[in-house]
Amino acid sequence: MQKLKQQVFEANMDLPRYGLVTFTWGNVSAIDRERGLVVIKPSGVAYETMKADDMVVVDMSGKVVEGEYRPSSDTATYLELYRRYPSLGGIVHTHSTHATAWAQAGLAIPALGTTHADYFFGDIPCTRGLSEEEVQGEYELNTGKVIIETLGDAEPLHTPGIVVYQHGPFAWGKDAHDAVHNAVVMEEVAKMAWIARSINPQLNHIDSFLMNKHFMRKHGPNAYYGQK
């Protein structure tokens, strides 16, 4: 697990590097599907002092199998998503400013241009709010459940992120680094959407044919963007 712990550590260190976290407001995890184990940032440990060996390994029930610290408080959310969507290899949660603002507003991040369409096939959805019973009960588990309720059976890698109402953004990818990459993009397109709608409140969504072109040329069966 040392290699995966190193990858998760590096991905976590990318969060402050890209300006996605303040203090310890975020974390990254990744899963080893063959072993059924998840590596995640320890709860509340400062990035300045954190080491790869500080990463915590849990099984799919959340039991710590390796590590001296408690795992992130978001562990139950991540495990619920890993169980439901086998294509996910890494997940990240932050409170990045602009994506969190859309979450607090209770609004999906609208697909307004090609930067968005290169990564997200449609709006980045916003979940419903959790009920008082859901919050007072198994809060983190129920956060995962409301994300799943919103995504349904859609391929999560086609829209690799979501904003949880009154909470903040979650993003995911094929591995930990891909998840962070998508979280960075989500924050940028959230900022772009806010600015664009401020300039033109009547701005419409990106044309569907342009959305399809930009997404499919990178992610479709006949993708031709980038190098093989």
Curated annotation (Swiss-Prot):
Q: How is the cofactor bound?
A: Binds 1 zinc ion per subunit.
Induction section of the entry: Induced by L-ascorbate. Repressed by UlaR.
| Pfam families linked to this entry | Aldolase_II (PF00596)
Residues binding Zn(2+) are 74, 93, 95, 167
Q: Which GO terms describe its biological process?
A: L-ascorbic acid catabolic process; pentose catabolic process
Database matches in SMART domains: Aldolase_II
- Residues that, per the record, bind substrate: 26-27, 43-44, 72-73
| SUPFAM superfamilies the record matches | AraD/HMP-PK domain-like
Tell me its EC number(s), please. 5.1.3.4
**What is the protein name for this chain?**
L-ribulose-5-phosphate 4-epimerase UlaF
Organism field: Shigella sonnei (strain Ss046)
